[in-house]
Amino acid sequence: MALRAYVLIQTEVGKGASVATKVAEIEGVITADDVTGPYDVIVQAEADSVDDLGKMVVNSVQLVEGITRTLTCPVVHF
């Protein structure tokens, strides 16, 4: 069974939409929506393991230009 998580992203001012578009192209990302509030983009992602999820966030998501901070929240039950 795959692991599902939400990744909450803060971006540089005015970069939410472009970050969401770029993150949506990453393998394992189900949705990437630009939103209002303390976070600018909320991502729903899946991976085979916690290790794979961490690698995706660190090696792919966090490399997108305009991201200043991420918070990964694994789903407990789905």
Predicted region positions:
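A compositional/biophysical signature of low hydrophobicity enriched in polar/charged and small residues
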Residues: 1-78
